[in-house]
């Protein structure tokens, strides 16, 4: 029997995480929901979920951002989903408060006539994205009014276009992956994707 892997979902205190837990559940995974970020970083994989607002989440992490950034730099595997991806950056126009700052850049509001960006949209992968847990996911479900702006394109694995705004929809730095969409709401393809990403991250530990 294979060793059980510990996955910790950090709960910002913003809402129901049931659909995410269901999407990533497996017999060889021990999934916990943690409200203490320092406890969450002891898991094999840390998951930053997509439920909540930047300001409240930054406040929930207050005092632990530096510890988390250090843990990520030391190789802690991490998956950030929607808001969780945005928290990997330094700051957001949405609210005051510091992000983790692991990926250089910031978060800005979409400058389009239709905000928020809701529903299914395409994902445009760069060729070098192969081997990053990508099982050819081409469309996914989005629900975002803010997007991540990297200092350069090196962390970006995929882009998505909403009206005339093209933004990073998948980023990776070391063992940390962020996705702007909600894989747990993206049907079977999304669930296959998020589980492939987690398996990829587990091998990095």
Question: Residue spans of the language-model regions?
Answer:
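Acyltransferase
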Residues: 176-205
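Short acidic low-complexity segments
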Residues: 31-42
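Pocket-forming structural segment of enzyme catalytic cores
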Residues: 90-164
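Cysteine-nucleophile active-site neighborhood
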Residues: 52-121
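N-terminal beta1-alpha1 ligand-phosphate binding loop
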Residues: 7-28, 183-184
């Amino acid at each position: 029997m294979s060793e059980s892997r510990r996955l910790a979902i950090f709960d910002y205190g913003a809402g129901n995480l049931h659909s995410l837990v269901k999407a990533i559940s497996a017999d060889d995974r021990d999934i916990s929901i943690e409200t203490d970020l320092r406890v969450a970083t002891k898991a094999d994989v840390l998951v930053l979920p997509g439920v909540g607002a930047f300001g409240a989440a930054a406040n929930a992490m207050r005092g632990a951002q530096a510890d988390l950034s250090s843990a990520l730099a030391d190789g802690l595997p991490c998956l950030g989903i929607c808001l969780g991806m945005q928290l990997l950056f330094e700051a957001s126009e949405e609210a005051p408060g510091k992000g983790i700052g692991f990926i250089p850049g910031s978060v800005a509001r979409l400058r389009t006539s239709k905000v928020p960006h809701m529903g299914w949209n395409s994902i445009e992968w760069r060729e070098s994205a192969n081997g990053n847990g990508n099982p050819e996911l081409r469309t996914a479900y989005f629900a975002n009014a803010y997007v991540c702006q990297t200092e350069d394109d090196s962390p970006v694995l995929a882009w998505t276009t909403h009206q005339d705004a093209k933004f990073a929809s998948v980023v990776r730095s070391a063992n940390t992956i962020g996705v702007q969409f909600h894989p747990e709401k993206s049907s079977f393809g999304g669930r296959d994707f998020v589980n492939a990403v987690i398996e990829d991250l587990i091998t990095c530990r």
